[in-house]
């Protein structure tokens, strides 16, 4: 399957292949999921299908390293809503390592632990185009890129380029964010079709 790799200077096509048939291919979509919304699910599902991954795990952060004093729903509720949101969806799961470890959720530390725990798994770390621009500031980024393959997905109003190796995947653009969902709820508006109905009922 031909996948585009974009840098500020070049645009080439790569043939993405399974490295070894006996190795598991797993995508990781990290986030606060505050709350989870339909764009999260579309991104996870489309990356899984297009890169032919075995599964994509949604990984809720305990404390995001890049956000200051962000109002965050209790981790129990964020996990419960994620569990409801992915119920019955093929190839999607939840990775709770950062909730269990607690503290600031640095991706390098998390992926180091996951690689040690699952040495026969190749990880694809999924990020939005806005986070691609931020990659140079990530904790131990040069070591991290040797541990995972970054996968970038386009977001409305963001056009990104980077010198780091990123596989770009086209997904339907949905301008939905967790903060938008929270604002709707604060204003007394119902975020129909923005979040799974089970999550809406839970809220």
Model-derived regions, located:
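Nucleotidyltransferase catalytic core that binds NTPs
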Residues: 1-202
